[in-house]
């Protein structure tokens, strides 16, 4: 738990270059550490949020595509989206001046396009920062189709080949940073635009 695997290292930067497996291993170690120190509520553990829990926390009772009550609305927003700029880091405010360079460059080669210190953008109604952009965040669920009927707190399919991550990142355009957007990755996959956020939940 002492090694930071991130490509972009700083005390206030989100972790990146962590797989789903890495994140779950961290959660298990943190749970054991906090339990041993008697700092963990009885019957609770640290884990990743389910996809449903993540979106619920991101939206904070909003119904718009962004959690500031605004939307990603136009084709022009695929480049510059002022509504998203209020709450998240994405590929244009992560280095707008390098747009043409970004189009012609390989993934991860632009120093101006990177993670940013957390807490610089506006939080949502529940005080959560960086739910849009910066790094995408692993969720507990296997990837699968949404349920066809109403379900409370769904947990995804029992098995698949990929896990969900949500929120978009500094490398994504606005449409991929919406509250509802979802993407996937192999459980062992590590990339410089995906990290994770902890959830404290009852042990199941």
Regions found by a protein language model. Name each.
Residues 182-187:
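Short, P/G- and charge-enriched loop/turn segments at secondary-structure junctions
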Residues 159, 188-190:
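A generic structural micro-feature
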Residues 9, 14-181:
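Functional-site microenvironments in short loops/helix caps that host divalent-cation chemistry
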Residues 1-11:
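Short, conserved catalytic-motif segment at the N-terminal edge
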Residues 191-204:
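Short, structured beta-strand segments at or near domain termini in extracellular proteins/domains
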Residues 3, 32, 50, 200-202:
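Generic detector of low-complexity/intrinsically disordered segments
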């Amino acid at each position: 738990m002492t090694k930071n695997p991130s490509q972009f290292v700083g005390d206030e930067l989100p972790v990146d270059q962590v797989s789903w497996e890495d994140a779950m291993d961290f959660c298990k170690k943190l749970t054991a550490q906090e339990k041993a120190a008697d700092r963990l509520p009885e019957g609770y553990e640290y884990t990743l949020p389910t996809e449903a829990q993540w979106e619920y926390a991101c939206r904070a009772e909003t119904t718009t595509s962004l959690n500031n009550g605004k939307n990603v609305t136009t084709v022009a927003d695929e480049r510059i989206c002022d509504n998203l700029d209020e709450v998240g880091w994405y590929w244009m405010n992560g280095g707008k001046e390098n747009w043409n360079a970004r189009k012609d460059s390989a993934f991860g080669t632009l120093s101006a396009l990177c993670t940013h210190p957390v807490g610089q953008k506006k939080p949502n109604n529940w005080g959560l920062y960086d739910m849009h952009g910066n790094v995408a965040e692993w969720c507990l669920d296997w990837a699968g189709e949404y349920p066809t009927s109403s379900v409370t707190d769904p947990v995804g399919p029992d098995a698949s080949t990929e896990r969900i991550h949500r929120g978009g990142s500094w490398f994504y355009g606005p449409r991929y940073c919406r509250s509802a957007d979802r993407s996937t990755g192999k459980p062992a996959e590590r990339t410089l635009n995906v990290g994770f956020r902890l959830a404290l939940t009852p042990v199941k």
